[in-house]
Amino acid sequence: MEKTQIQQLVKQFPLVQELIELNPVTWFNPRATTLQAGLPFVGLDAADVADAEQRLARFAPYLSAAFPETRAANGVIESEVVALPAMQTALDQRYGLSLAGRLLLKKDSHLPISGSIKARGGIYEVLAHAEKLALAAGLLQLTDDYAKLFSAEFREFFGGYRIAVGSTGNLGMSIGIISARLGFSVSVHMSADAREWKKQKLRDNGVNVVEYEQDYGVAVEQGRLQAASDPRCFFIDDENSQTLFLGYAVAGGRLRRQFAESGVQVDAQHPLFVYLPCGVGGGPGGVAFGLKLAFGDHVHCIFAEPTHSPCMLLGVHTGLHDGIAVQDLGIDNQTAADGLAVGRASGFVGRAMERLLSGFYTLSDREMFALLGLLDSHEHIQLEPSALAGMPGPWRVTADTEWLAAQGLNEQQMKNATHLVWATGGGMVPEAEMAKYLANARQSI
């Protein structure tokens, strides 16, 4: 971008200057509207999410057979919700502001198979593709017991097909592990930010890892090119995939059931705020869509990004979406939050969800590490840095009394509020790597 173009953009959107200066910002979205008004722009609806849920139910016997760690939950890939009372007290002190509602954590960080939120969308898209191939070949009926897929016959069949994906780490882990287990030949194109241990875990699972010196966008593009020249290769497109998006969206109805079972109320008098770390946008976008379908206008979804990679905030705030990258403004896209190291947001997610997202904020790597250390010491929960991005959210919301008033949210409603931080990854981080994170955290607190 030319200097004059940047100056023009800053003049039109002063917040962009704050992003360029890498200052942590909070922005509430003036275009946010009701579910009824915003839903038509998504291009998907509750029936699509129900279809995804049914597909996952069909695959539960397969997952149970192929991944023993899912057996206790009968082949359902789901995570628990836990309260964080000690962390809430610690952050009240850290931010000098008392949070009126209750702080909860959604532990997608500890999802089975791949230990991140990507176990939702990534695994779902591979299963949907496998089902399509097996149905077309006449090897499978929708009424079959899908446990039959866990067999030499099906591994041989899927072995004739290839899957490719570009990833900063966690999506590649999910897609690589499930694809290889089914029998596919799978290549994961990894950006420079990807952690070494994630690459090694993939190799240990029989996955072909292709490494790049460049960022996420280049890895995705190369994966796309590989698939384009090979009719038997299926490219999973993190930037544009509706199937991935729907895999994530299933989380909404499941959370509603979890809340019903544990007595967490969500209605006009008991608002729900959900804080989602955002990279390219597919995971948080899909989850937010599912949450809006499940809780309607009583849920407020807020995206969190690193100060060095604020791609979705930039795209939605300016309305340019994937027409602008943080690098165009001289922002380097270098962050320890490897899952969030994305310079250009998904245009599909930005345009689909811009009317259903309440707000966005950024935070520094140093803050993520400090929060990582605090969560470990106060709650004995260990996450990777990017999974902490949602943690300051409740205090950012509480601090903006003007926005709360504009939403018609009063003191009593905020006392009744539930603040859910979506922990996106960290359950499979090796001990040595976690020790490094915690050492960094001690310096950051």
Swiss-Prot record:
Entry's family note: Belongs to the serine/threonine dehydratase family. DsdA subfamily.
Cofactor: pyridoxal 5'-phosphate
EC number, UniProt record: 4.3.1.18
The entry's keywords: Lyase, Pyridoxal phosphate
The protein, known as: D-serine dehydratase
Catalytic activity as recorded in UniProt: D-serine = pyruvate + NH4(+)
InterPro entries according to UniProt: D_Ser_am_lyase, Ser/Thr_Dehydratase, Ser/Thr_deHydtase_PyrdxlP-BS, TrpB-like_PALP, TrpB-like_PALP_sf
Extent of the signal sequence: none
Annotated gene: dsdA
Top class in the EC scheme: lyase
Subunit: Monomer.
GO BP terms, alphabetized: D-serine catabolic process; isoleucine biosynthetic process
PANTHER family: D-SERINE DEHYDRATASE (PTHR48078:SF9), THREONINE DEHYDRATASE, MITOCHONDRIAL-RELATED (PTHR48078)
Keyword Lyase: yes
Molecular function as annotated in GO: D-serine ammonia-lyase activity; hydro-lyase activity; pyridoxal phosphate binding
Record has Thylakoid as a keyword: no
Residues recorded as bearing N6-(pyridoxal phosphate)lysine in the entry: K118
